[in-house]
Structure formats: C-alpha cells, structure tokens
C-alpha cells in the first residue's frame, strides 16, 4: 500500500511541478528515481519533498504513530546522457532482481520497466519521447525494443551486481563531463576525487555526509538547500 501511495504522489509531483520522470523503482527498503532537471533548480527538491513528505504523513496517520518515516539519507548523482544514462536505466530496472525478490523486472509492479515497455495513455509517469531522445534514439519504438534487449542481455550475462557509482558518486559520465561538473562546483568539489573505471568516469562524494531523512544537509556534504549538482548542471539525475 505504501509503495502504491508513493507512486501516486510521484504522479502528483509530475502534475504539480512538471517533474520529468525517466525511470523509478520502489523497493522494500529504498527508492531509485531517475529524472531530468530541465525546468529549474526547484523542481527536483520540491518534488522529492512532496512525495516523501506526503507518503510519510499518510503512513503515520494510518498507523497512528509519530516520528521519522525515512530513516536514511538520499543520495543524488548527475548522469551524462546516452550510454551512461542507459546503464543507470537498466541498473534501476534490475533492482528487485538483484535482491532475489523477482526473476525479471516485469514481475515487480512498483517500477518503471512495464510502463517503458507498454506506454500508457492515462496516468502517464514516464516521459517517453524525452527518454528516447536522451538515449540517442530517433523513435521511442526503437528505444523500447533496445531497452528490452539490454535488460535481457544483463539477465543472461549475470550482469546484475550492485554498482557503487550510483550510490557514492556526485556525477557519472565521460571525462570531459566530470571535469565540467567539478569545475562548476568550484570550492565545493575540493577533496572529491575523479575515478576512472573501464572508460567511465565518476566524481566521488565524501560519504561522511549526505542528505538525511528530513532533507537537511549534514556536515561533510557539498550540498545546499536540498540541491547540489543542479545548481551548476541541468541534466539527468538519479536519487
């Protein structure tokens, strides 16, 4: 029920703020959300506060309880388009397969895979054409077919392990992309390392600090006012 409520409030965030949603997965103990920041710096933090806040409020009312609902911080990563975005997309799709709950992402109802494969006419969450455009495809149908193949190949190859770049990086992409992000962050990026792995580059966060459950900034994080990288970069992001 709480997962379904979270998805409903995600749709409300899209309606209210114009949040551009590329993929998502609501698991048993955490959430992945892949979005595009193209409408201004307040859209993503406002949307997250709405979804998280209302979900927590409704849960507490239903359970007649008080106190924190979200017990852990959320982490945000800026992602370069095309192949890096594709990798993140599939990583999110396979989340519940990684945990052993399902054998295929189509079996999990609280994620974007099924909508990506079977676009809706009503209550649409995923920005279909934008997703195709950002991944380098001319048509959504071409993207959809390729997306299905990527997931199938990952499952067949056993390429379904946890990848630290999505949970411990400020940004993921090409070397030039990462250097641009670091340069724009200026002094805020001091001490953050650029790491290369098989042609993919990451700007790593200092994990001593991050967002807490109430969306405040803890000591050690580079952020401010619920947003760090979208102050300097408007693009794809995964939380």
Annotate each PLM feature:
Residues 1-23, 27, 36-239:
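Short Pro-Cys-Gly-centered "Cys-loop" motif that presents a nucleophilic cysteine in a tight turn
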Residues 32-33:
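N-terminal functional module of multi-domain proteins
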């Amino acid at each position: 029920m709480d997962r379904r409520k979270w998805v409903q409030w995600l749709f409300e965030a899209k309606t209210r703020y114009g949040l551009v949603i590329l993929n998502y997965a609501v698991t048993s103990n955490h959430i992945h959300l892949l979005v595009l920041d193209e409408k201004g710096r307040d859209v993503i933090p406002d949307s997250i506060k709405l979804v998280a806040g209302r979900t927590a409020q409704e849960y507490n009312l239903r359970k007649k309880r008080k106190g924190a609902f979200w017990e852990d911080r959320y982490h945000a990563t800026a992602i370069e388009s095309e192949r890096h975005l594709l990798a993140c997309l599939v990583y999110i799709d396979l989340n519940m397969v990684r945990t052993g709950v399902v054998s295929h992402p189509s079996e999990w109802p609280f994620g974007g895979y099924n909508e990506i494969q079977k676009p809706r006419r009503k209550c649409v969450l995923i920005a279909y054409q934008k997703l195709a455009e950002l991944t380098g495809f001319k048509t959504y149908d071409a993207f959809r077919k390729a997306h299905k193949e990527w997931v199938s190949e990952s499952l067949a190859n056993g390429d379904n392990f946890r990848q630290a770049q999505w949970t411990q990086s400020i940004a993921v992409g090409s070397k030039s992309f990462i250097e641009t992000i670091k340069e724009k962050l200026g002094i805020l990026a001091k001490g953050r390392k650029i790491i290369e792995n098989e042609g993919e580059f990451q700007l790593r966060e200092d994990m001593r600090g991050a967002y807490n459950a109430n969306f405040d900034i803890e000591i050690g994080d580079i952020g401010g006012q619920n947003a760090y990288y979208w102050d300097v970069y408007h693009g794809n992001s995964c939380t």
